[in-house]
Amino acid sequence: MTTNHLPTLTYEDIPFLNSPDGRILRILAEYIKPLALFRRERIQDTVVFFGSARFRALDEASRSLELLDATGSARPAPMEEQPATSEDLAGEEVSQLRRDRAEAAVEMARYYEDARRLAFLLTEWTMTMRSRRHRFVVTSGGGPGIMEAANRGASEAGGKTIGLNIRLPFEQAPNRYITPSLSIEFHYFFMRKFWFAYLSKALVVFPGGFGTLDEMFELLTLTQTRKLAKHMTIVVYGSKYWNEILNLDALVKKGTIAAEDLKLLHFADTPEDAFAILKESLTREHLKGMKPEAGAPEEPLDEEAEMSLRPEISKTMR
């Protein structure tokens, strides 16, 4: 006697879903799930923070330097941060490298603390808004460093905060400050980037590396080419760092961008200055009828705001 086995339901067939043939379904899932989640949580728009995953809080970086002074050893850097192994360097060189790294970590920790403070100020302000939807929610890539600092500051202010994490073989794990219901894990970078761009009304770029540059220039390009059907405020934080990394004036001089394009960027060096830029711009462009110094108005009734709760996709990108 034979037993008939029912075939696996297609949507429960894990090998198929993880196969090349199932890729389109995986991509679609990374589009539909965040959309459903943001509707359920009544998220209208966001302010996105970009920056290095490698910066630590000031107290943590200071303890590491103190430990190095006391014992000659500090918390080792992740493998992807280490440019050489002990086999490549002599003992004295290794010790000096560790000290240089520890001192740099303390110096760069100011950006962690500044991102934390800015996120706090922004969230504290948005929580005064009388709205059925959450406005200008602090959003990060969900990992450590500047991402953690942004989520941490927003959480400390008592607000919701979003983490759009990416699954990587190293470095990236969701930080503990993300609102649990707003922590999303992505496999595809391009879908994660879509959600950074889709709801954001402003971008704050802290010092960072390849990933930060990639994310910043993609959104800068979308803004320059007017592919975003909305006003996007871009704040570049830490002029000393960025002036060493970028020479945008050279692009103008060589004719590869227009001088007018430089106006897309606003530079700031303190959390208070960055917050002032964001508050003025967000109020002017996205809170109709509200003066920068006034209290928050009743729920805005513009078409984009109304469509954000409908089944249709709101027209924030062309």
Predicted regions and their residues:
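Glycine-rich beta-alpha loop segments
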Residues: 3-8, 14-164
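Alpha-helical scaffold segments in soluble metabolic enzymes
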Residues: 27, 117, 121, 149, ...
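Solvent-exposed alpha-helices and their adjacent loops that cap or buttress functional pockets
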Residues: 39-42, 129-133, 155, 175-178, ...
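Short, solvent-exposed amphipathic alpha-helical segments in soluble enzyme
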Residues: 64-67, 155-156, 218-223, 250-253, ...
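Residue-level recognition of the N-termini of beta-strands and the immediately preceding loop/turn
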Residues: 134-137, 230-233, 262-265
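Phosphate/pyrophosphate-binding betaalpha-module
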Residues: 139-206, 210, 217
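Short, acidic/small-residue loops that bind anionic groups at enzyme active sites
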Residues: 158-171, 206-207, 220-244, 259-260
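C-terminal functional extensions of proteins
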Residues: 236-318
